[in-house]
């Protein structure tokens, strides 16, 4: 259970915003319960991103919005509340990533979500707390804490690092304007 604590914003860099307790506890618990449910549909992806895939890397994903089109209409109402809180005008992609625990922290590879877009932003909502993190190249490291959101411009190179202490690291990734 996530306590109903008021959100707080941390700025690790003028270009990166970190918001703890981004959603109220009720909405977050609904979202977390849906995504972590054993019957939630996951799809295997050989590799973590298209640019720099370390050998043996893989993840499971679930697309809610792909190429501006809603792909999971059943669960989209839970996601739309996050979009409203973010102030999204246009959705390009929303997907949830599940990275299994590894023996040591693995860098998933640096990448850009939308390098050619002037207006696209990235938001990552951490679904579970673990000892993994996101590194935003030249701007700092954001630890995986449940209900923490990090926002930055899509032209900023970033990489996810796996966890070693929990069964899985789960993040909800938004590309939006």
Segments and roles (model prediction):
Residues 142-158:
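Conserved metal-binding segment of the jelly-roll/cupin
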Residues 123-125, 166-177:
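A short hydrophobic beta-strand segment most commonly corresponding to one strand
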Residues 105-110, 118-120, 126-145:
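A short beta-strand-loop-beta hairpin characteristic of the jelly-roll/cupin
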Residues 2-90:
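Non-heme Fe(II)/2-oxoglutarate
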Residues 98-100, 127, 176:
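Short beta-strand segments enriched in hydrophobic/aromatic residues
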Residues 76-81, 86, 90-118:
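Internal catalytic-core helix/loop-beta-alpha segment
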Residues 109-111, 157-165:
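Short beta-strand His + acidic residue motifs that chelate non-heme Fe in jelly-roll/DSBH
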